[in-house]
Amino acid sequence: MTDQDNKPKNDLGLFAGSNRTKERDRTAPRADHTGKKENMNVLPANIGWLYYKDYYHGIPFHPGQKKEEFKTLFEAKNQAITTRQLSRYPEELAALKLDYQSIQRFELTTEYPGLVTGLGNPHESHQEGEYKLGFYFDHTTGLPVIPGSSVKGVLRSAFKKSPDYIKYLLENPPEKETPIIDIDINQLEKEIFDGEGLSPYKRDIFLDAVIVAGGNTNQLFLAADFITPHPDEFKDPVPLQFLKVLPQVTFRFQFRLKNEGLISSEGKKRLFERILKDLGIGAKTNVGYGKFKE
């Protein structure tokens, strides 16, 4: 076994600024304060770092700066993010997968218009051309993920808002599966999401959903999009540019589910999959974002 084999995962080029990450990304464009692109071998491949740390580097915020100049500078920054190809991140993709026997998983693929998550995170300088809203990235790999807390929240909201819907799913499973009849939905909710009546070691755990594949031929997985709020009918609406995950990107939803309580771990997994396909996840689901298919 070599010294490389003995290194922990965080020494294998997964953190922003690590040597192996730099080597893989020598030709990535970076915009200086003049708006020109330059090749810099110190640019990390960590997209989260690009979005939250490097994004405003080199932008001259001073009185008299023209809107058109800001737009040109941010266009270069935006392109450096949206032209990233998923095939350039094999180590990061492998690190996010949890291939253990104790993990239950299923994979779903984004549909048009895509997925947005983390919009509430601050990301704005009130200048022309920038991405105005936040986005959620895994801190270590820099790839988009759906936090386990968000997955848990969406699933629980289905129990709270529509117990009859949950009851219907349990009583009407896909073909060749056994219906679950006469179950207390309120008790099932508390058992799954609060661990009520269960030992801490026997409670269900909701893990981050991670990207495993991209279905686009060019391996792109991020893109710009716009929303146009109408806060006042007498004012012209101002489009807001934001970042999204493209359609045809496959996410793996991962859980550590226990065979304890009212239904089995396999029953919970199948239930969760049907809920997510029906309701979607992330921001702007009311206008079509966050929808998935098998």
Where do the protein language model's features map onto the residues?
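Basic, Gly/Ser/Thr-rich N-terminal segments that form RNA-phosphate-binding interfaces in CRISPR RAMP
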Residues: 1-294
